[in-house]
């Protein structure tokens, strides 16, 4: 029931007319400008719907092939795997098909108004930057990128191009999410000193890379699937992005993009990235990871990552702790805070609200949020029984996560998950993936984008692209 209720907040509604956008295209310099190139504006005059290109039609891409056509034109479908989502190609027969998003942008640049990226993690950055360079607003699925450098590059390019952006952490649009944000900022929980976020999956902890597995099938463009990653012979095992650091981010990208979202935004942690102190004293975020063992190829079976956040934006210091897998002591700690047992494990009928979630602990009360942060409960329940939790009372409600971005594409306000915010959240999380590759703690300067105390860790903030690929 919680999941069905949460999905209601993501529903699409009738959009603003494109002609209305064009009539009001000259808005203030402080707003987010979009569709700024003449090619996009030219195609925008044709009708009231935006022409959307989708890069990645399987997985999360399936959602967009069903929802976007309700309000917009889905004019291009791009995927390196021809077997993905065949039903979409039948339903959207007028959409042009591509394997290479660069070719798509070259061939259809004048016809495309905006781009959605739903590829594996390691190609989020290259696909998104290609679209931004082409003057197209971008909606990129979470995690924003695989590395911290890629994330920062996306933020800076989106600012330079003055384009509407959003990351796909859908809980941001939920009424309860925005209500919880109000309660935290209004002091209903008192002073927040600790936040716990979790997922019970853990990592694969693979010790050896896959060996050559024969030729790639003809329906898959293996070279394009690899994208910016170093070339290696085909093996389908590489395509499970949750197994390998070179291609994925595991649960810190997959789930913590959701579970950390409410506390990170409500406590304005992004200010450490976006609003540097006028005194010039750079903030330092300290992060320490415990784990089942260092694994630079894959991800540890379990991990506990602790970020120490300094005072900022009117909030005092706060500690975020990520619990992933069967980390010693984590389940007992979390069940004590939640006040009941958590349904962890592999059984198919487990409660989805238990295996991932967030606990925000204040001096006067606690918030237990579900995995997407789309619903929550206040604890102790008797203390807060008269507090409504379903809709915001002060901040603006959302018309739907994708809809907020589409309205920004038409000149509306920036989406809450725009790349300014999404970069900060993603850097924060990917710093955790760097920390799990070491035993010692790290000191990160979010303004300079630098690990101050560990040269090897600092080198992992970026990655080398193979020839022919760049941001």
Give the location of each predicted region.
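N-terminal secretory signal peptides
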Residues: 1-16
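N-terminal export signals
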Residues: 11-14, 20-40
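C-terminal segment of N-terminal export signals and the immediately downstream linker at the start
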Residues: 35-71
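NAD(P)-binding Rossmann-fold cofactor-contacting core
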Residues: 74-91
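Beta-strand-loop-alpha-helix segment that lines the small-molecule cofactor/substrate pocket
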Residues: 120-121, 125-173, 187
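Core domains of carbohydrate- and sulfate-ester-processing enzymes
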Residues: 196-239, 462-464
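Rossmann-like dinucleotide-binding domain that binds NAD(P)(H)
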Residues: 223-315, 326-329, 335
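NAD(P)-dinucleotide binding in Rossmann-like oxidoreductases
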Residues: 295-297, 308-399
């Amino acid at each position: 029931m919680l999941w069905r209720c949460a999905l209601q907040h993501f529903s699409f509604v009738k959009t603003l007319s494109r002609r209305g956008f064009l009539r009001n295209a000259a808005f203030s310099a402080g707003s987010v400008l979009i569709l700024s190139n003449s090619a996009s504006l030219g195609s925008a005059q044709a009708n009231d719907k935006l022409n959307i290109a989708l890069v990645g039609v399987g997985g999360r891409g399936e959602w967009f092939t069903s929802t976007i056509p309700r309000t917009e034109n889905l004019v291009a479908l791009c995927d390196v795997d021809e077997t993905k989502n065949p039903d979409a190609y039948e339903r959207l027969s007028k959409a042009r098909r591509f394997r290479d998003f660069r070719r798509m942008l070259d061939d259809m640049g004048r016809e495309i108004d905006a781009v959605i990226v739903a590829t594996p993690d390691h190609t989020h950055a290259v696909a998104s930057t290609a679209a931004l360079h082409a003057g197209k607003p971008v909606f990129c699925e979470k995690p924003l990128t695989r590395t911290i450098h890629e994330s920062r590059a996306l933020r800076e390019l989106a600012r330079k191009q003055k384009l509407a952006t959003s990351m796909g952490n859908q809980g941001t649009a939920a009424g309860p999410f925005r209500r919880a944000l109000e309660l935290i900022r209004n002091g209903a929980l008192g002073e927040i000193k600790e936040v716990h976020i979790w997922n019970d999956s853990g990592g694969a902890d693979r010790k050896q890379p896959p060996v050559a597995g024969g030729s790639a099938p003809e329906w898959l463009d293996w070279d394009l699937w690899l994208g910016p990653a170093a070339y290696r012979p085909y093996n389908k095992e590489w395509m499970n992005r949750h197994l390998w650091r070179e291609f994925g981010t595991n649960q810190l990208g997959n789930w913590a993009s959701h579970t950390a979202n409410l506390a990170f935004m409500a406590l304005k942690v992004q200010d450490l990235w976006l609003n540097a102190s006028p005194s010039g004293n750079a903030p330092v975020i300290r992060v320490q990871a415990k784990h089942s063992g260092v694994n630079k190829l894959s991800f540890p079976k379990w991990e506990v990552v602790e970020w120490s956040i300094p005072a900022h934006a009117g909030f005092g210091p706060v500690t975020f702790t990520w619990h992933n897998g069967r980390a010693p002591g984590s389940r007992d700690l979390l069940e004590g805070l939640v006040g009941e047992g958590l349904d962890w494990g592999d059984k198919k009928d487990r409660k989805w609200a238990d295996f991932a979630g967030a606990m925000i602990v204040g001096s006067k009360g606690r918030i237990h949020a579900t995995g997407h942060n789309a619903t929550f409960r206040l604890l102790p329940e008797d203390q807060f029984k008269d507090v409504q939790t379903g809709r915001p009372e002060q901040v603006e409600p959302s018309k739907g996560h994708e809809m907020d971005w589409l309205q920004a594409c038409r000149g509306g306000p920036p989406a809450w998950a725009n790349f300014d915010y999404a970069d900060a959240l993603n850097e924060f999380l990917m710093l955790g993936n760097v920390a799990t590759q070491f035993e010692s703690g790290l000191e990160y300067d979010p303004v300079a984008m630098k690990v101050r105390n560990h040269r090897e860790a600092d080198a992992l903030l970026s990655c080398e692209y193979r020839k022919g690929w760049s941001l």
